[in-house]
């Protein structure tokens, strides 16, 4: 069996090596020619999977090691009887941790307390739902907007207009062009122009959900709007001027914990095994190394807010990835695009909060609750 796979999918050989011959390629370069004699295709979000890619190939199963599947023509796969799996929820915790890190660092830089802010979440799917729960447990007032879920009967949802009045707006929608609730340029020029100077905007879903030209024009005014972008139009050839105007600009790595990325590999491995009628022989724990930061300890007298922010930034500080991307923006256009992909391909080992054990010596209940809210693994002595 021949398996063609995006070279950025981790642990390909340990999970799939016994199934067949693996051929790896940069995800953006996978073409119809590469798939003529392939049986299985494994991708990430940078590969558009449709009739043009798969026509006259032998591909019988497509696995996408990603939460979303906007890049896959599911109707075409169904019409051809091609099996499919993505990995819903695989990196949801990682994206939540990215947003929490942004808020932690911004609270210090801009001088505010988290519990004094309201947060508007646009899209209450797997990621948005987890973020809502975490921020609520941290004491923030959270309002979520998700019209499809509201139409399906979910409760405690708010209108887009209400959510856009929150101090912090964070985007977690799929990219859709059709249906009752299209999300392409959901934040259009009018909405962007009406954002308050004291608001914070974070986007970790899809770049096309925002009108980037309008956002760049707004930021060029320099009136105080704070923006953190991890996703962009036309990746990897992103808008340099917009990136330089962002408070934080990162190369589509919000979900890139080792745990989240490898969980995606494990999920599509499990689905392919079942599709082929094979036993599921491997588990993720067999292959993951110990995290570089395994343990932190706080004493009973520690200030809870200080402990929270220290733990968050020690585990993941968004400023590192921001500086890495902005360092590439001085290069010429072809080299910038290559560096964007290289930063993703060679991304450092970043582990999830739940891989770090925090010991609280005589810890207070409020500190236990606070650290637990964002996913840390706790023990109290």
UniProtKB/Swiss-Prot annotation:
Pfam families named among the record's database cross-references: 2-Hacid_dh, 2-Hacid_dh_C, DUF3410
CC terms in the record's Gene Ontology section: cytosol
A Gene Ontology BP annotation from the UniProt entry: 'de novo' pyridoxal 5'-phosphate biosynthetic process
Keyword Oxidoreductase: yes
Enzyme class: oxidoreductase
EC number: 1.1.1.290
Residues the entry annotates as binding substrate: 45, 66, 256
Compartments, as annotated in UniProt: Cytoplasm
Residues holding NAD(+): 146, 173, 230, 255
Gene Ontology terms for molecular function: 4-phosphoerythronate dehydrogenase activity; NAD binding; protein dimerization activity
Pathway annotation from the record: Cofactor biosynthesis; pyridoxine 5'-phosphate biosynthesis; pyridoxine 5'-phosphate from D-erythrose 4-phosphate: step 2/5
Matching InterPro entries: D-isomer_2_OHA_DH_cat_dom, D-isomer_DH_CS, D-isomer_DH_NAD-bd, Erythronate-4-P_DHase, Erythronate-4-P_DHase_dimer, NAD(P)-bd_dom_sf, PdxB_dimer_sf
Record-annotated active site: 206, 235, 252 (proton donor)
Catalytic activities: 4-phospho-D-erythronate + NAD(+) = (R)-3-hydroxy-2-oxo-4-phosphooxybutanoate + NADH + H(+)
The entry's keywords: Cytoplasm, NAD, Oxidoreductase, Pyridoxine biosynthesis
Job description of the protein: Catalyzes the oxidation of erythronate-4-phosphate to 3-hydroxy-2-oxo-4-phosphonooxybutanoate.
Family of the protein in this entry: Belongs to the D-isomer specific 2-hydroxyacid dehydrogenase family. PdxB subfamily.
Subunit-level organization: Homodimer.
Listed NCBIfam families: PRK00257.1
Protein name: Erythronate-4-phosphate dehydrogenase
């Amino acid at each position: 069996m021949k398996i063609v796979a995006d070279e950025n999918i981790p642990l390909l050989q340990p999970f799939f090596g016994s199934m067949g011959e693996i051929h790896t390629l940069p995800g953006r370069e996978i073409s119809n020619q590469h798939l003529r004699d392939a049986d299985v295709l494994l991708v990430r979000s940078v590969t558009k999977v449709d009739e043009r890619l798969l026509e006259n190939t032998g591909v019988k199963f497509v696995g996408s090691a990603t939460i979303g599947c906007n890049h896959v023509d599911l109707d075409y796969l169904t019409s051809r009887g091609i099996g499919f799996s993505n990995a819903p929820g695989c990196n949801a915790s990682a994206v939540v941790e990215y947003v929490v890190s942004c808020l932690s660092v911004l609270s210090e830089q801009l001088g505010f307390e988290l519990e004094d802010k309201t947060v508007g979440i646009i899209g209450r799917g797997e990621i948005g739902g987890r973020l809502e729960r975490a921020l609520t447990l941290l004491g923030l007032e959270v309002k979520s907007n998700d019209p499809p879920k509201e139409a399906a009967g979910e409760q405690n949802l708010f209108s887009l207009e209400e959510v856009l009045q929150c101090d912090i707006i964070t985007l977690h929608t799929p990219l859709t062009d059709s249906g009752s609730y299209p999300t392409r340029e959901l934040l259009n020029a009018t909405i962007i122009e009406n954002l308050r100077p004291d608001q914070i905007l974070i986007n970790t879903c899809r770049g096309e959900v925002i009108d980037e030209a309008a956002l760049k024009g707004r930021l060029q005014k320099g009136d105080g709007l704070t923006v953190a972008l991890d996703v962009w139009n036309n990746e990897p050839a992103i808008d340099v001027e917009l990136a330089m105007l962002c408070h934080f600009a990162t190369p589509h790595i919000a979900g890139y914990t080792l745990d989240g990325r490898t969980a995606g590999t494990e999920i599509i491995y499990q689905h392919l095994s079942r599709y082929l009628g094979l036993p599921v022989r491997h588990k993720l724990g067999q292959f993951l190394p110990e995290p570089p930061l395994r343990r932190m300890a706080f004493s009973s007298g520690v200030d809870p807010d200080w402990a929270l922010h220290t733990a968050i930034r020690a585990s993941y500080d968004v400023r590192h990835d921001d500086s890495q991307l902005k360092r590439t923006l001085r290069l010429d256009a072809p080299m910038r695009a290559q560096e964007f992909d290289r930063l993703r391909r060679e991304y450092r080992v970043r582990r999830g909060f739940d891989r770090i054990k925090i010991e609280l010596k005589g810890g207070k209940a409020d500190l236990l609750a606070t650290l637990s809210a964002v996913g840390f693994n706790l023990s109290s002595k």
